[in-house]
Amino acid sequence: MSTRKKWVNSVDRQYQELLSDILKNGVKETKERTGTGTIKVFGRMLKFDLSEGFPLLTTKKMFIKGITYELLWFIKGDSNIRYLVRNGVNIWNEWPFQKYLQAKGLDKKYPKYSQEWSLEMGRFVEKVKNDIKFAKKWGDCGPFYGVQWRNFWGVDQLKWVIEEIRKNPGSRRLIVNAWNAPLVDKMALPPCHVMYQFNIAKGKLSCMMYQRSVDTFLGLPFNIASYGLLTLMIAQVTGYKPGELTLALADTHLYLNHLKQSKEQIKRKPFPLPKMKVERKVKSIFDFKFEDFELRNYQFHPPIKAEISV
């Protein structure tokens, strides 16, 4: 017999089950890029019905402002953190900052995550925010995500896929790909969420995203909400209702310094999902602004602090 009725929402339920799965079945990996160490599983899938509500976790408070601005940043085809930091979003600062330290020979002077490192990053961010020339030189994350969405060797994939949804909704080629192999080494971080595909059935637009690397505690909750919002946006501009969001997860891991936090989140009882109201109808996805979105009835547990691994 299904236990779904015992749960307030399937988003938190599936996420908590994934955390439990990793904690129980995960294999320890110490030889990974960041040096933090992980426990990981491989090949998992999440599926959400967007008609149930907006897929934003309630078992910890989520940074919806950051999720929305990051997605608008991707849609713009931008990769410079200046747009984000000028809007109070600091989720990508670590990568260009670390590159800056290495280029200046300061990475030994400011060890990662030390108090000195944090203070110096604050000064770096202020320069990016207020000095356009400095931002152009040091604030860029390279040709990742939005750059590839909007200019994959000259192809505006996002524009194309929306036009194709309108003209040929039965197509099996409604794909946007962020993995541009010759340019991966020029990116601050190669894309974790690599590609996504749309499908139209019974008047509903559904999205499936493939993710090669999944920071389950910090990154995945962002990714779920971001692709949920992207699906809502594209559904509106193409005249469909939102359908399902499916995530195919490859290397699905918890960093070793996130285990305690994960166990805490598993214990929390979910609230009902919120609703995302799109305040303004637009014809083009490129016309959306932050003010066009209103999150309603969002109940949540307190945030859980965790350190990002760079």
Language-model regions: role of each:
Residues S2-V310:
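Terminal, non-catalytic protein-protein interaction segments that mediate quaternary/complex assembly
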